[in-house]
Amino acid sequence: MDFQNDFLTNPLRVTLYNPAENEYTKTFIFLGSVPANVLQACRKDLQRTPKDKEILQNFYGEDWEKKLSQYVVGGDGDDLDEFEKLFVEDSGEETNVMMPEIETMYSEYSIFPEDTFKDIREKIYVATGIPPYRQHIFFFQNNTLQVTYRLLLSGSGVALDIRDYKKEFQQVGGLNIDASMESQKDELYVEALDSFQLIKNIHHIFVADLNTLVAPMRRQISIAIEDNYQFDLLYYGLIMKYWPLLSPDAFKLLVQSPLQMEKQYPALSPSLTSLKKRLLLEQKLINFTYARAQQVIAKYEGNRLTRGTLAVTSAMIKISPLVNIQINVRNVFDLFPATPDIPQLVVFFYSKTGPTVVSKHHITSTEPEKFSNKTFRVPTIILIRFINKKAFILTIQNNGHYFIESNWSENERHDFNSVVSTLNNFINPIIHTINDMGPAAFPRGGSLPLPSNEDIQISISSMSVSTFWPYTLSSKGFTELKSRWREYEQAGIISVRGLQQTGVYNFLFKKGIYSYDPHEIERMIIISSGPGRKMDINVALLQNTYAYLFDTNVAARWETIYGGRNIRIYHRVTDIKIEMFNITQEEFNYLWVYLFVFLDNLITGPDKILVNKLSQLHDKQQGKGASQLRALQEQDPDLYDLRKYDTQATVYSVLCQHPRPPVIYSEAEVKSMPPAKRKELVKYWNFTEGVPAYYSCPHPDYPHLSLLEGRHPLNYCLPCCQKTKALLGTKRFYINNTCLTKHTFVEQDLEDLNTQTSRHTLSYGKKIPVNRIAFLPHQIADELFLNTIKEPDIFCIVGVEQTMLGISHAGLFYSLARILDLAPKALAIEIAKAANTPQYYILGNGAGNMFSSGAELASLILQTFVEQKNQLLQWDTTWQDIFLDLVAICYDLHCVFFKDKQGDFEFEVSPSTIQKILSPSKKIAIIFDTDEGIYPMAITQQKRFLKNSEAQYIFTEDDPVMEVIQSMSEFMCKDNWWDIHDVKNIPGYTVGKKLINRHNFCYALLIDSDTDRPIYFPIRLSSYIHDDIPIDFDLRPTQIASFKETWKFITLFNKQYKQYEIIPSAVLQNIKKEFVGFLSEGKTGLYFYYAPTQTLPAALEKLPIATLTIDPRDIDQAILYPLEEPYPQQNKANKAFYINHLYKFLLIEFFDVLYGLQSNTTRKHIENLFQKTDFQKITSVTEFYTKLSDFVDLNDIHTIKHILETTDAEHALKVLQKNIFNFDYTLLSPLQSYTYDELCQHLKKLLTPRIEFYEDIETIDRGLINIYTSCQYSTLNQPQCEKKRLRIPVNHFENYIHILAADILNPLKHSTLLLTGLGVIDDLQFILRPQEIISVKNKF
């Protein structure tokens, strides 16, 4: 990494320019801290001796005379993207010319590459005495005159060339002014850019001093500004145009009382004495940084970007295509479905109702409103994608620029390359999906480039980065560190705010930070003056962002937004950690040098701190309590931060209490130890860094390292010191050796250990290691299950895994695998197969409804439990209900639970399981849900289990245990309603079918008798058993028994089951005045339906009538079958809708034809000009732009100029060909030269090849034709297209041609016709998918 001050050997030249006389008056050369002999040789100027010239040549190089000359050098340096660029008019002048001989002054103030133009203004002030507000700075770059701000008139850039001052013929107060500025003053806007661009490689700038105009005319100006109109002419026609740092009041003060400027406007005219003092201190500190930079880089460069010393914790990548791409973000939003992986999308666009934000989210989304309240500047779509619990955010703007951002844990130690690679892998599938949308997303063609494409620019910004200085300081040393930053604060390099925390030093680094959004100040001010709050900012702020220099309110907001990058330095036991927030990659490299030069100076050189302020290795060895624990977590957080993987895990400080935690050393630290000390260390592993780590146990009472198994969620072994050494052949010796070799201790290791050691059965209440057993609690084993088993059998609960990557509370999953004697992954694969069923939605009492299909549910099961690549979001417990149902389906196994609530046990069983238990055929498992985990219950013999883990987990009808469970289940359902068997007992009637809803509950029975139609008999929602009675998931049938047959059955039912008597309370009547059913009272309260009748049944005559405005069945049908074949009336409406919009479809084809005709012609003109131009000669460049202006507008010229400046000649023509220009949209003008009849004939000739004629229209689904594109390119299923041509009835085509011709010849219709580019019929009509929720907000 190069860190040099180029301005030391190629100094900045500042030439003063007098616009009144159009002459250059003096040049100041900023030499900086050069050797004394160089300074002396420079100042001799024309009296330099050969020795002086030799000194200058040795220092500045062979071209020293050019570097110290008065040439106006054009085309040097880097491009300043943020600055207003103006074409050099053909004035007969070349920019590389020698000026008349003028006075040259030499300044010892240093210029640095990290100086912004705001800094340059201050250094010009101390060198020349011209305060910042009087300076109009301009310079040349790439043959272009540039200034340090942007002046906009009605949104368009205003040409700013102070050399044209004398060309203005209108005067006020003796000064030339541009009167047109005053007449449009409300449309003027000044954007201050001084703080957002570095001087970089600009080595010659010019300054026009306002005083050269004002001082000679002060009396005349004073008189003129007494008149408001003349004042406005002066201010807007001259001052705001060239010296916008001045507010109207400040300009008036400058004219009337110039000596009061420093007092009234200290930011515009700072104290010269204070400024000189600060700049000299800044120069001293920055020169020191440059002097030490290369040495420090060489010392630390090997580790600077390595995983151990760098961690990117958040970042944003910006992808900027080199060509303009028009992307319809509204359509992308509409066509892109929300899924569990991409659970939320937000779009901002301009709809028919104004600025609109639409958000949609999958029902599994945990933050459905995220980003919906964001402030947008341009049409934008935001997508959030989850990969392995990590959220990635993609933001795409309508010009094709897009941004990718995410966050990472510091422990992941991502460097810049891995961040780019990770984000690229995330973005590629989404970009491919969007590109496949074709013209629906890209109405003018093109596609979004991938990050690997050569036609893009990539930048990394908004980064938060942690880096580590590999030395430690004592508390006194860290205090010394803080005090040394005070000089940097006095120099203005940093800013310290607020109270400081112990062990942390927090400040804002200001110097050289420039990558801000200049528009952010506007947004903040708009927020502060929104509805309901009084606006306390001067209205000039909205016109001029230099207001921070003359308005204290704006200054405070400016400092908040642009005050620097937040830096935090942490005092740690093992190193010094530095966090940098919201920085770019360029800023990281720059800040890293400043920070590490500062830190290295603490331990090297004449200013190094005292030895007793450095934290020694001995201090680490004698660390106590919290410091030891902190050192372990700092050096290996993956091992010691257990709750990173399981929020319920016991923390390390409890597992290994003081003074038992060991001391950890890195390999570098071990190398510096004496050989005798190294022999005492135990070699283990650093799980965070993936390298060896070494441990010692310094406390005399606990001198032996041991490794704890079964505590870490990922089965890592945890180091902890013990009193005694593990003896050979013991269990502890085996565990320690396994951990030191494999670094983990898992179930298989435990099984291996079982064959070597015997174990006792644990008491209930403790956490049960994998494959260990524990006794059942006394009240369950000895009371509830009394006499159900015989010795030597025992009841026990068996230890299983409790955690899994991507999901917490995984004990149930592992319990089911143990019960079924299956490998966990094999179980997941089998139940995933069972999940992929049309009735997936009934799983988990309707929890399956969260998914759009059984395939989606099956996929998520595999991703989570087999591949472990996903998370279950907020359904982290709902999955358990789904799994229990799937196990019941696959293995006919039902589970009951004993839940331990602090010693009080609750018996829990689902209604469907109760039904199974009460049926003749049953097979159950018993599971204990405790605070320590979820475990299966078993019957085993202790010795048998120790030998081969044999146990009984499943209980059937013949087991005594089943009798206990069955009696408990009967007790739980004793208050339930009649069961289906009761209905079976009514003579002459049988249950023909059970109707099941989407929550998998039975809601009605269809009773068969000797009639043709079944009786509809509702019941309270209840679980059902799988028996010989068919089940039906469809809607309530329409063909049902009459009231007479229904009432006959109810009468028999009431007679046999008086406790459940059905008593009607109201008659149900539909909107056709038909009687369709009744509502029952009492315990039932259910809707009984029968075949519609016009006659009120006699048995119901005295009851009130309840009108059903909408039949609930119709609502269910709309929900369950929204895409079924429409009613005939709907089909007629769709046909009419289609015919009414055929004209818009025809316009799409019409414009597509014109794009191909006209834009190709214009492009050929541009290509011919490009090939004939020598871009190395200014006269040839001027001729190129002059000719270009004959057939393209100013905005297109700006676009072409930007392409030529940012692209090498080899690729420039290719980029031009791909780009979209304004001339691509100016299509109708050539056609207006035709007569009406001629135009009709021409249009027929153009469009007939695009039309597929037909006689009549078939069924049309309206939902498919909201988004429409040319049939030539459409990638969507569009019913208006056939064979890539538009389908139009023969009798309509002639009419449309006449309408189109009339519209083209009508100038008032131009904008209406061009609106078809929107690509939608109704921009607020969106595709409705299952599992998606859409909300719309207007933004005003």
Curated annotation (Swiss-Prot):
Annotated TM spans: none
Q: Which UniProt keywords apply?
A: Transcription, Transcription regulation, Virion
Q: What is its main location?
A: virion
Question: Where in or outside the cell is it found?
Answer: Virion
Q: Answer whether the UniProt record assigns the keyword Transcription to this protein.
A: yes
Keyword set includes Phosphoprotein: no
One GO CC term, this protein = virion component
* Top-level taxon of the source organism: Viruses
Q: What does this protein do?
A: Putative initation factor.
Q: Which family does it belong to?
A: Belongs to the asfivirus G1340L family.
The molecule here is called Early transcription factor large subunit homolog
Its taxonomic path starts at: Viruses, Varidnaviria, Bamfordvirae, Nucleocytoviricota, Pokkesviricetes
